[in-house]
Amino acid sequence: MIQMQSRLDVADNTGAKSVMCIKVLGGSKRRYAGIGDVIKVSIKEAAPRGRVKKGEVYSAVVVRTAKGVRRQDGSLVKFDGNAAVLLNAKLEPIGTRIFGPVTRELRTERFMKIVSLAPEVL
């Protein structure tokens, strides 16, 4: 469960290491974001020669949460931390690689590229 001011790790090779959620997209009163939701983030920590710089604002999709996601069969998929993948204005991933596992819930028309780049889909 991600809300404003939440810190997330970045699970791609854009050069960003840490981001902070500044807005949960999808309605004026929307408070929390889960796996597969799009949020606005500010880059808080970045590699020196990365594709993104500290302080820049991007869209991102949440790919892992410590809260987890409940499946239809009753199982719960949780992770050790929260992670996101940075997106451009067309909601396509900026990076060319994804690090760590992602969940099956991302298998929608919008994020198939992320699922295909991920090393493991849970």
From Swiss-Prot:
Biological processes, Gene Ontology terms: translation
Matching CDD domains: Ribosomal_uL14
InterPro entries found in the cross-reference section: Ribosomal_uL14, Ribosomal_uL14_bac-type, Ribosomal_uL14_CS, Ribosomal_uL14_sf
Keyword hit for DNA-binding: no
Protein name: Large ribosomal subunit protein uL14
Keywords, ordered alphabetically: Ribonucleoprotein, Ribosomal protein, RNA-binding, rRNA-binding
Keyword match rRNA-binding: yes
Subunit structure: Part of the 50S ribosomal subunit. Forms a cluster with proteins L3 and L19. In the 70S ribosome, L14 and L19 interact and together make contacts with the 16S rRNA in bridges B5 and B8.
Family: Belongs to the universal ribosomal protein uL14 family.
Record-level Gene Ontology MF annotations: large ribosomal subunit rRNA binding; structural constituent of ribosome
Function text: Binds to 23S rRNA. Forms part of two intersubunit bridges in the 70S ribosome.
Organism expressing this protein natively: Methylibium petroleiphilum (strain ATCC BAA-1232 / LMG 22953 / PM1)
Pfam families per the UniProt record, alphabetical: Ribosomal_L14
HAMAP family per the UniProt record, alphabetical: Ribosomal_uL14
GO CC aspect terms: cytosolic large ribosomal subunit
